[in-house]
C-alpha cells in the first residue's frame, strides 16, 4: 500500500472515530421537554438524604431549575434570589426545586453555607439532567445547563427558560407564575 493510501485510510479512521464520539456525546441528552407536555417524573436524593419524586409535588406549582455547580458565583446568585423570594412562591402554592450533578453532601454544605431552605436534588448519574435536555459539556465534564421548567399543579410544563441570567431569573419566574395564577 502506498504512503498516500495509508494516510487516507488513517484520516478516514480518525474521522469515523470522531463521528462515533460525537454521536455518543450527544445521545445522552434527550430533546428538551416543551410547554404543553407532561413533565417527566423522576426520583432523586435531596440534601437531607430523602428521596424526592417530582410526582410528590402534584397539586402545587413547581419551579424546577437546573444549575451547573454548587458554590459557584452564578449558581449562588440564582439560589440566593430564589431564597429571597421563597415566601412569594409559597403564597402562590409553589415549590422551588434545584437540580445539579453535585453530590448530596455538596448540596447540604451549599444549603448550610448560603441559608437555602428549598430542596436541592442530586443527579450524579445525570439521567434526569439528560431527560430534561439540560446536559452541558464543560471542558470534558458533564454538568447541568442553567434551564428552568415551570410545572403546573397537574404536572404539565407551562413555561421553559433556557440559558437564564441568575441575577434576574427568580423575578422572571415569579412574574410568569403570577400570570398563570390569575388565569
Label every model-predicted segment.
Residues 5-13, 18-41:
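N-proximal helix/coil linker or "cap" segments that precede and/or mark the start of modular domains
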Residues 39-40, 61, 145-147:
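Short loop/turn microsegments at loop-to-beta-strand junctions
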Residues 55-76:
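Short active-site neighborhood of thiol/selenol oxidoreductases, capturing the structured segment around
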Residues 143-183:
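Thiol-/selenol-based redox modules, centered on thioredoxin-like
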Amino acid at each position: 500500500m502506498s504512503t498516500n493510501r495509508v494516510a487516507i485510510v488513517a484520516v478516514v479512521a480518525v474521522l469515523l472515530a470522531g463521528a462515533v464520539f460525537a454521536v455518543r456525546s450527544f445521545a445522552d441528552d434527550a430533546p428538551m421537554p416543551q410547554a404543553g407536555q407532561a413533565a417527566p417524573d423522576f426520583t432523586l436524593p435531596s440534601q437531607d438524604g430523602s428521596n424526592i419524586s417530582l410526582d410528590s409535588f402534584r397539586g402545587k406549582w413547581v419551579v424546577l431549575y437546573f444549575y451547573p455547580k454548587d458554590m459557584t458565583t452564578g449558581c449562588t446568585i440564582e439560589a440566593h434570589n430564589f431564597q429571597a423570594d421563597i415566601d412569594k412562591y409559597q403564597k402562590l402554592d409553589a415549590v422551588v426545586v434545584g437540580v445539579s450533578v453535585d453530590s448530596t453532601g455538596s448540596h447540604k454544605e451549599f444549603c448550610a453555607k448560603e441559608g437555602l431552605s428549598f430542596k436541592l436534588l442530586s443527579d450524579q448519574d445525570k439521567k434526569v439532567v439528560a431527560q430534561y435536555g439540560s446536559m452541558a459539556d464543560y471542558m470534558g465534564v458533564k454538568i447541568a445547563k442553567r434551564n428552568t421548567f415551570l410545572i403546573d399543579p397537574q404536572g404539565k410544563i407551562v413555561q421553559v427558560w433556557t440559558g437564564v441570567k441568575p441575577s434576574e431569573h427568580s423575578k422572571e419566574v415569579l412574574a410568569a407564575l403570577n400570570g398563570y395564577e390569575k388565569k
